[in-house]
Amino acid sequence: WARITPEMLNVSASVAMAELMLSGCTTASDHLYLFPNGCRLDDTIDAAREIGLRFHATRGAMSLGESRGGLPPDALTESEDDILRDASRVIEAYHDPARFSMVRVGVAPCSPFSVTEHLMREAALLARSYGVGLHTHLAESVNDVAFSREKYNRTPAEYAEALGWTGPDVWHA
């Protein structure tokens, strides 16, 4: 990940989107949560616009690195202020709530194991203030369930509900 550039991100997104369109897909979503070397969600949104694919981009994030009890390496994390500020910027720049719009943006902390409880709550408040969707990965393995029970004394579903991460504007992977 340390060598990925904005151009590489744009080209790889363009190729993937072209393959999707060739198979008949007209709408896709992507959960981008790594931003090395100046990469931004804009790089994938630009690819979707160039290709002509309807795109639901989600501004992912990881703020809780290994040194603080999270799963991702510290080098892949961002400050929570930067995450929330960039999520607002991307929503304001690109989100189109109109029916049949070509670009929508959601807020998507990577998982409860890679961000703080504070960021999960703030991300939900931010998304709802803009009327955009919320996305995260939740209970993908028995290890995820064990982590949630050990760290939060709750199942992943109970934890998500306690943080306001349930409802018609939320989708979990």
Where is each model-derived feature located?
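Metal-coordinating catalytic core of metallo-dependent amide/deamination hydrolases
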Residues: 39-173
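Divalent metal-binding segments
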Residues: 1-41, 109-119
